[in-house]
């Protein structure tokens, strides 16, 4: 499938999901220059660097605007390193509260395990809410018992 066509389908699926679930704000993490000095090996570099992430963001912004959904672009630096569950300040530190214990699995300072991508996503959402001056204790909402199953096993949409 052609990349542009795939990006249209992915962005449409995200917007449809948001509309179906009455979600009105999309937080998108972005790091300027994040693919510039990547070194994953020749083949992986070619596959990874060719992903048109900026194109996806532009499509999301356009489709979300048509649907009345607010898009907030957030600098995602250190969102994967800092522990959302420990309410760690998202910035560079000498020592971090949590850590990755293996690929895809993050453990907080208090011993709670969470999917590493979920940890990063929650930190991006937290930064986005701060950017919008929203005072909301997202942690309390996320840790409600009915939401805990998503912390280790995220739902795949596409």
Residue ranges, per PLM feature:
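Positively charged, helix-rich recognition surfaces that bind polyanionic ligands
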Residues: 1-158
């Amino acid at each position: 499938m052609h990349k542009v066509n795939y990006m249209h389908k992915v962005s449409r699926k995200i917007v449809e999901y948001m509309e179906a679930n009455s979600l009105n704000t999309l937080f998108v993490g972005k790091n300027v220059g994040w693919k510039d000095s990547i070194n994953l090996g020749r083949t992986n570099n070619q596959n990874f660097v060719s992903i048109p992430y900026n194109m996806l963001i532009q499509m999301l912004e356009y489709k979300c605007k048509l649907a009345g959904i607010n898009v907030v672009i957030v600098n995602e630096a250190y969102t994967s390193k800092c522990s959302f569950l420990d309410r760690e300040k998202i910035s560079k530190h000498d020592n971090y509260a949590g850590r990755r214990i293996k690929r895809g699995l993050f453990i907080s300072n208090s011993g709670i395990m969470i999917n590493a991508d979920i940890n990063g996503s929650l930190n991006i959402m937290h930064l986005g809410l701060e950017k919008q001056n929203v005072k909301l204790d997202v942690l309390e909402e996320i840790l409600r018992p009915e939401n805990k199953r998503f912390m280790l096993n995220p739902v795949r949409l596409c």
